[in-house]
Amino acid sequence: MKKKLAFLGAGSHADAIAPVIDPLLYDFVGFFDDKDITEHDGYPVLGKLYDVLPYLEDGSIDAVFITIGDNAKRKELFEYVAKDYYDFIINIISPNALVLTPDSICGRGIFIGFGAFIGSKVKLFDNNVVNTGALIEHHTVVESHCNIAPNATINGLCYIREEVYVGSASVIIQTLDISSCTTIGAGAVVVKDIIEPGTYVGVPAKKIK
C-alpha cells in the first residue's frame, strides 16, 4: 500500500525534489507552509509548517519530507517532527544517483539528487541535502542538517560537521575537518581544516565573515 506523503515547505526546493518521488511508493497529498497560500503546483497547502503533527497522529499523512533549503530552519523542523514521528520522515534518492555502499544512508530526511555520487564507506546522517551532480568521496562523514550544492566535491576521508553549506562547484580536498555552521562559497577550494564557523570563499578558501 502506498504511503500518503506531504512536504514541509512549498517553494523552489520542493519543486526540485518533487520529480524524484517514487510514484510506486507514495501518493503525494500536499504541502505545509507558512506563506499565505492555499495551493502550490496544483496541490493543496494543508496548513502551516507546525500544523503537521495532528495529520501524522490521525493517519491522514504517514510520510513527510522537509523541503526547505536553509539548514537552520530545516534542522528546527526536523527535530520538531522527529521527536515523536522520526519513522515517518522518509529519504528521497534519485534512481540516477550512485550510492556505492547502501550503509552510507545512516539517517532519515536525506535527499540525494540526479547524478550525485556517494563513494564507498561514506556516512550521511539525518536531514542532509546532496544536490544534482555533487560528489562525496570514500570514507567521508557528513553529520546532520548539511546542504551540498550542485557539482560540489568533497574528497575522501573528510569530516563535515552539522549545518555546513558547501557551495556549487566548490572543492574540499581530502582528509579535512569542517566546523559546524560553516558556509563555503561557490567555487571555493578548501585546502586546510576549518575550525571556526563562518563564511569562506576563494582559492584557497579564506574566511570573510
Predicted regions: what they are:
Residues 37-98:
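Phosphate-bearing ligand-interacting subdomains
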